[in-house]
Design a protein with these regions (language model features):
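Beta-lactam-recognizing serine transpeptidase/beta-lactamase-like catalytic domain environment
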Residues: 1-193, 236
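Short, gly/Ser/Thr-rich active-site loops of penicillin-recognizing serine hydrolases
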Residues: 97-108, 208-236
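Short amphipathic alpha-helical face segments that pack within enzyme cores
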Residues: 65-71, 205-212
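Short beta-strands and strand-coil junctions in structured, solvent-facing domains, enriched
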Residues: 199-201
Length: 236
């Protein structure tokens, strides 16, 4: 509440929310990053403190795509360096990549205290490897360290005096399971955003999917020896 919607809107926009930050992804949606002006224009209502509370946890009017979640996560992994999503990797022949793909146009995100990045990354590592980490089960047995955050997306609203019971709710109304993360934590090579529709638990449903994606990319595509050498601090 002390931060307020204006500051939240400013910083969330720097992480790519409320816009299409892709370079060549046709049909990418901007989501919805609400503001005072947006609510006044769309609903003819003022912005209430409760709206800020909802927005702070990604609920209420706020909407984000899985790609936007992955993009924002990459900013954390890269300590503020932008990598705008694109489908095209390279161009064969004499044509230069720059001639068919617009250059990245978003400025890197700088903060006054760089240690803040490390605090966030360390906290995300604890989610995966800490004694109380919500996704520690998904990271069990890994020979590399990963960073992540579990979550849920509410599908429908409960009454104030009603408790959520997944067993008694029809499947199509159950919470969506969410997970965002990257690996290796100390030398990021892959960022993922996972949503399992009506999956319920981010830690029990979405995080294991992300772990499988990490393993596939780091071990099968890039080679097990390379990831082990990076984990030991050697040059790949």
């Amino acid at each position: 509440l002390e931060m307020g919607v204006d500051i939240m809107h400013d910083y969330l926009s720097r992480f790519g929310f409320g816009m299409d930050a892709t370079l060549d992804v046709g049909g990418a949606l901007p989501g919805l990053l609400p503001s005072r002006d947006w609510k006044r224009g769309m609903r003819n209502e003022p912005w209430y403190p409760g709206d800020s509370v909802n927005m702070s946890i990604g609920q209420g009017f706020f909407l984000a795509t899985p790609l936007q979640l992955a993009t924002a996560t990459s900013l954390v992994a890269n300590r503020g360096e932008w990598v705008q999503p694109r489908m095209l990797k390279d161009v064969m022949g004499d044509t230069a990549l720059e001639s068919v793909l617009e250059p990245e146009y978003l400025e890197d995100l700088t903060i006054d205290n760089h240690d803040t990045w490390e605090y966030v990354v360390d906290s995300m590592e604890d989610v995966m490897h800490g004694r109380r980490g919500t996704a520690r089960g998904a990271a069990e047995g890994a020979d590399y360290r990963m960073a992540g955050k579990t979550g849920t997306a509410q599908v429908f609203s409960l009454a104030e005096d009603e408790e959520y019971d997944a067993e008694e709710i029809r499947e199509r109304l159950r919470d969506h399971a969410l997970f965002i993360g990257f690996a290796p934590a100390d030398d990021p090579r892959i960022v993922v955003s996972v949503i399992v529709e009506n999956g319920g638990s981010g830690s029990g449903t979405a995080a294991p999917v992300a772990r499988a994606m990490f393993d596939a990319w780091l071990k099968e595509f890039n080679g097990q020896d390379a990831i082990i050498s990076r984990a030991e601090g050697e040059q790949p």
